Amino acid sequence: DAAAMKVADIGISVDTAVDVAKESADIILLEKDLMVLESGIIEGRKTFANMIKYIKMTASSNFGNMFSVLGASALLPFLPMESMHLILLNLIYDSCCSAIPWDNVDEEFIKLPKKWDASSIGKFMVWIGPTGSFVHFASFAFMYFVFCPHFVSHGVTYNNLASHFTGDKLNMIRASYVAMFQTGWFVESMWSQSLVIHMIRTVKLPFIQSRASAQLTLLNFFGIIFITIIPFTLLGKVLGFSSLPLSFFLFLLPCVLAYMILVTAVKKAYIHYHK
């Protein structure tokens, strides 16, 4: 047995076997039950699946956000979000993602072994990342041309403020305009990033055919609530945020819903193209 176990891909023995057999084995069973191996294989495949989920989610999200920040910085006369805002956003988002190791895994994924494919991460990132940027740019346009002018500057866009206001009032309106814009994108980013996790985590139809674990769902929910209330708190004032009017959420809800539908469609196209 020892000779055969040495040349085998995986040698299996029990703890009551002779020493030479146990030394040759890769796995030593504490019980005489091979079902332990099945459980270990299933848990290993679940761990691999959730690891891939997190890597793809984070890579595509960061790529999309980076593209959005670069584009907005080139097009807008001010920064779309301060560095401290980005750090706080990523900190809370990553905290929400900490429940991914306990997420549910589709049974179809664990039926057969999967291989590590680093190239698939780049492909997925290129497909999903720009999808998020497209929605972000649509949000930028809405907040810059419609939302902020309506609630801050009496219908005047940022570039035209100097022709309508002067002195301290001009500076005050500019600061309020930027704060309102940055706050809107800060909240919209957390909503979209957190909810799109449910679109990316499965190849099935999310919420209907496949549901996330309770841990992941609850952390997502609390993360969204926490980010949403920050602008209304003292911490929000310290960070330079502005209190959002309730009408902002009338825009946010359909925007995030459209983003979720769009990501699901792009994901289906990606799976069809790369299967």
Kindly give the residue locations of the regions a language model identified.
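C-terminal transmembrane module of polytopic membrane proteins
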Residues: 90, 146-167, 171, 176-275
